[in-house]
Amino acid sequence: MKLYPTIGLEIHAELLTSSKVFCTCSAEFGGEPNSRCCPVCSGLPGTLPVLNAKAVEYIIKAGYIMNCEISRFTKWDRKNYFYPDLPKAYQISQMPRPVCLGGHVDVTVDGEQKTMRINRIHLEEDAGKLVHDDIERVSLADYNRCGIPLIEIVTEPDFHSAAEVIAFFEKIRLMLQYAGVCDGKLEQGSMRCDVNISLAEKDSDKLGTRTEVKNLNSTKAIQRAIEYEIYRQTELIENGERVVQETLHFNDATGETSSLRSKEDAHDYRYFPDPDIPPIIFTEEELAAIKADIPEMPEQRVARYTGEYGISAADAKVLTDSKRVSDLFENAVKAYNNPKPIGTFIVVELMRRINLGELDLDNMKFTAEDLAKLIELAETGKISKDNRKIILREMLETGKKPETIAEEQQLWIKEDNALLEKTINGIMEANPKAVEQYRSGETKVFGFLMGQCNKALKGAASPASIKAMLEEKLKG
């Protein structure tokens, strides 16, 4: 019997608001435990929530970039359950009237484009965080995260492999970063993914019993959890055992899932309207203004880079696969309007250093303007392209301006014609065979002779000057 996995996702993304969704406490990550709480987010009796308008704006932007229909009327509900990280014993969420309905996002997996449907996106408050101390045998509650605005993106069960899930998750993350809605910092828990998995025969109209793996916050964890759960369910079914509908925890250390609790359905949470938060009716003018404020998305930047700047599609994709890289490129082009060499340098030189861990864009010692100046110095013939790498290395280490480094290390190109002629004569005398080959029509050796001259001159003359004089000398 061939079993076929069907997967649906619930992606939770924290919004980039400065304050929490129903109070004025800071929504910034970190802080001393329980230092960013107030009576509202701590769930004390007699407090009233006040809705953060910026959070509503951000969920509408998220809906638009995912091709959702924005509800003209929306309201909030109480999702009732008890857990130590939820001081009110209910979570303010949305059930029958979410802000966003429907929608889809296209992803490419193994060269094939697939459309993944979205069921809904709703706005809710995050819960707190439990810290378990195995030595003292206690669990500590940190409520700093309580009340941070969160959107939950609920997909249709359109996924059938870990590769499809990861492609979708990464694209959603990138889109939210570009829209300025979520920072996508997985290591800080800004985005988390719950994965619902069931197995059934490929042509069956009926899905199997589903399990939910909770709170996966890295693509590696998502992949391993899906692969293990498919394996576990396959073993159960093939051995004639029953798959239990339950919520699971994924253990990073063992690579296995374990049961947390039975899997709840919506009616188990006893949703009812929150009486303290009035519904919202959006006007067409309000929605149009929010939509007009959405920044350029990655696909739009790729089209502009290839169409206006003449950058290759492959390089344009590299430049836009990270918002930080793309913003660096954008700001450098503003400082020096020569996009193609800037883009090539970022793709070839900076990306290599980023991948090697030599450059962290969040803690860069030089600015986009410094990068632009470095490219300009090389493109205008003031430094050689070899010396450009030397200057970049120093910029990475010290943050000094490229002009300062060029001056300190005497890396400027000095057009000394006497030195240039003497060097070329010496290279030709040292390589008589190559000279003869060139004069006999084997012009390929010109590159070799140019390389020898560049190496000997060490940036003391521009490539154009070297080329012109070398060609003249070789004519005999």
Regions found by a protein language model. Give the residues of each.
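Structural motif
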Residues: 1, 310, 333-342, 382-383, ...
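Basic, nucleic-acid-interacting segments
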Residues: 1-296, 313, 334-338, 348
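Amphipathic alpha-helical segments in well-ordered regions
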Residues: 62, 229, 332, 345, ...
